[in-house]
A protein has these predicted regions:
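Short, non-transmembrane alpha-helical segments in secretory-pathway proteins
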Residues: 2-35
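Polar low-complexity intrinsically disordered regions enriched in Ser/Thr and small residues
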Residues: 48, 60-63, 87, 94, ...
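Exposed beta-strand-loop-beta-strand "reactive/processing" segments of non-cytosolic proteins
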Residues: 36-70
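Low-complexity, intrinsically disordered/propeptide-like segments
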Residues: 31-34, 100, 109
Length: 118
């Protein structure tokens, strides 16, 4: 049986967390580049990043119309459709740590969330 030190274990967790953070930033960039009608941001929760969208007005400034687009699990990188403001729907739609799933997510992503339906 292989043994790991606490530092090695912590380093692996940190590496995975940094990778998930990087992919979430790429996800936001993809969403923001696909529309001028919304601006997308992430909010930190206890377990999930909440991906929110704000409607952009005709003057190009953010309005006060805010909604949840999706959730990303901070520990696993799984992407979920929003069931409401505070909770994701059951069943992950994409896995940001899996290259094929991530590419499919980014290719199909849109501001309306249609790609998140099963």
């Amino acid at each position: 049986m292989e043994t790991f030190s606490i530092k090695e274990h912590f380093d692996k967790i940190t590496e995975k967390t940094n990778l998930i953070d990087k992919f979430v930033e790429e996800y936001l960039e993809v969403l923001n580049n696909k529309t001028n009608d919304y601006n997308f941001y992430k909010r930190h929760g206890k377990r999930f990043y909440k991906i929110t969208q704000i409607v952009v007005g005709r003057d190009g400034k953010n309005t006060d119309q805010l909604s949840v687009h999706s959730f990303v699990d901070m520990n696993t990188g799984l992407v979920y459709k929003a069931a409401g403001w505070n909770a994701p729907a059951k069943g992950a739609r994409f896995d940001l740590l899996d290259e094929a799933s991530r590419k499919r997510c980014f290719a199909n992503a849109d501001s309306y969330g249609g790609y998140l339906y099963r």
